[in-house]
Amino acid sequence: MPHYRSRTSTHGRNMAGARALWRATGMKDGDFGKPIIAVVNSFTQFVPGHVHLKDLGALVASQIEAAGGVAKEFNTIAVDDGIAMGHGGMLYSLPSRELIADSVEYMVNAHCADAMVCISNCDKITPGMLMAAMRLNIPVVFVSGGPMEAGKVVSPTDGKVIKLDLVDAMIKAADPNVSDAEAEQVERSACPTCGSCSGMFTANSMNCLTEAIGLALPGNGTIVATHAWRRGLFEQAGRLVVDLCRRYYEQDDASVLPRSIATKAAFENAMSLDVAMGGSTNTVLHLLAAAQEAGVDFTMADIDRISRKVPCLCKAAPATDKYHIEDVHRAGGILGILGELGRANLLDLSCGNVHSGTLGQAIAQWDVAGGAGEAAQTFYRAAPGGVPTTVAFSQDKTFLTLDLDRKAGCIRSKEHAYSQDGGLAVLYGNLAEKGCIVKTAGVDESQWVFTGRARVFESQEDAVEGILGDKVEAGDVVIIRYEGPKGGPGMQEMLYPTSYLKSKGLGKTCALFTDGRFSGGSSGLVIGHASPEAAEGGAIGLVEDGDVIEIDIPKRRMHLAVDDAELARRRAAMDARGDKAWQPLDRERVVSLALQAYAALATSADRGAVRDLSQIKR
């Protein structure tokens, strides 16, 4: 029978000092026999996805204590990728994932907590906490802050409501044909409420995937942050984690532990969902990283295999301007997509979860198109309120009807899929021997096979300058290199270059290839995560202006049309540069000691950009 971890610091005469300190936090005699549960919050006033979380830790804590536990809250850091985008701040985004994972481990292990409720929301916070949960392997429930409502403006031409998000503001601002007044209206309307950005961007993708893995409650990824019914997820999480504690520590039920739930089959289910919903390409990095922390052998080869058999069943911004996450919720949310995947025999329904036994049981209870009961039918009618606010649970609007149209609605059946090819794909070739990632859900089918000439940039900044300076033309393949985990360092997101290609009218006539990564808001023929990266000797570092690049998504091919002898000559010339080899020639970039430490241990994207501690020389 496992022992409560907290009793290390709460029991025995030799822990008198620790108990004295616990008493100073408010604990009483009767509390020392209860489970101590960490409420892992991530409130910050810097991030709209987290600005409303301040009081939600206390809400969860109240339910933990009502259920017989002791709640102790702490915060992690949280970086807003949108605010950090387009300048040196983006170098810190991906490395912050490792800091978050480490900080959760440090706090939970230092204080011998028995379990956790992880209150996350945005891009690196959910994966960082997920990595920590896999390391610690103690009972955990994830509950996120929820998605932002989509922005809305009325079209001056036809009076119809147009849905907006952050990316629209960026594209309009960079388009010289858009007036200052129109650009300002879009900017003021694009992000109306608290919550994670309203499309199928990285934050929402990850919060949806925690549902599929089995560590979050139904609705976690899709019910908007402002809706009153989201409060119930936080309250239920607080009560549920105490029950999970008792099952593990008092009944020796290890099935409730994260590593028991997040098996290889669960990661494959999550990836199947990701491919079906066209999730952010960043999710590939984060699932690979979490799987490594869990000790699960889940690799790019598994992702490639899944991407070849799972169709695209759901589209939301940026893949379409018709639907945002609030519309995915109305169509049945993540359990609705999982229900369609289940009917197509594309899931392992025996996988467990924290709330409903098995995935199959969860689908039976919550899949609104599969006969779920009145509670589910009501829950998925939760709608946006349409009032700008930073306050959680501040409105209770509902849709009049659900979107159950599986032929032409937001979520579709396999028979009526947006495409039988999935929403994400892994490409291989001499430009990416270990793979690269494209979000096919966001690529116009006319570009699935594309040949163009390389236009090479040694940094994101140079690429932005080149695009805005009209140095990129239709038919070009923009190459942005030395932006990988090690070469950046930090693997910057390329949202500005992809947005500016659209602003210049090149969104459907150019491609972009990088060893960096993309915001979930990027769309178009944009291919990232080139592995190995340029700084690790990847062939992307050998591309020259004018080289022919061949892209074939159906054949999963990424090819540099240069013969092997010429590539060998270029590689030898690069190696001959000695200490300057595999580095950008003329890039001015200040790299702090903290980022240098990350770069020294960072792996390429095919391994999730995790740190490789074997690189430490003793």
From Swiss-Prot:
**A GO MF term:** 2 iron, 2 sulfur cluster binding
Listed binding positions for [2Fe-2S] cluster are 122, 197
User: Quick one: a GO cellular component term?
Assistant: cytosol
Annotated pathway: Amino-acid biosynthesis; L-isoleucine biosynthesis; L-isoleucine from 2-oxobutanoate: step 3/4; Amino-acid biosynthesis; L-valine biosynthesis; L-valine from pyruvate: step 3/4
* Necessary cofactors: [2Fe-2S] cluster; Mg(2+)
Comment on bound cofactor: Binds 1 [2Fe-2S] cluster per subunit. This cluster acts as a Lewis acid cofactor.
Which residues carry the post-translational modification N6-carboxylysine, per the record?
A: 124
Question: What catalytic reaction does the record list?
Answer: (2R)-2,3-dihydroxy-3-methylbutanoate = 3-methyl-2-oxobutanoate + H2O; (2R,3R)-2,3-dihydroxy-3-methylpentanoate = (S)-3-methyl-2-oxopentanoate + H2O
Database matches in InterPro entries: Dihydro-acid_dehy_C, DihydroxyA_deHydtase, DiOHA_6PGluconate_deHydtase_CS, ILV_EDD_C, ILV_EDD_N, IlvD/EDD_N
**What is this enzyme's EC?**
4.2.1.9
Q: Which enzyme type, at the first EC level? A: lyase
What keywords are assigned to this protein? 2Fe-2S, Amino-acid biosynthesis, Branched-chain amino acid biosynthesis, Iron, Iron-sulfur, Lyase, Magnesium, Metal-binding
Where on this chain does Mg(2+) bind?
81, 123-124, 493
Q: Where is the active site?
A: 519 (proton acceptor)
Q: Name one GO biological process term.
A: isoleucine biosynthetic process
Q: Which NCBIfam families match?
A: ilvD, PRK12448.1
State the function annotated in the UniProt record. Answer: Functions in the biosynthesis of branched-chain amino acids. Catalyzes the dehydration of (2R,3R)-2,3-dihydroxy-3-methylpentanoate (2,3-dihydroxy-3-methylvalerate) into 2-oxo-3-methylpentanoate (2-oxo-3-methylvalerate) and of (2R)-2,3-dihydroxy-3-methylbutanoate (2,3-dihydroxyisovalerate) into 2-oxo-3-methylbutanoate (2-oxoisovalerate), the penultimate precursor to L-isoleucine and L-valine, respectively.
Q: How does it assemble?
A: Homodimer.
Member of which family? Belongs to the IlvD/Edd family.
Q: What is the name of the protein in this document?
A: Dihydroxy-acid dehydratase
Gene it is expressed from: ilvD
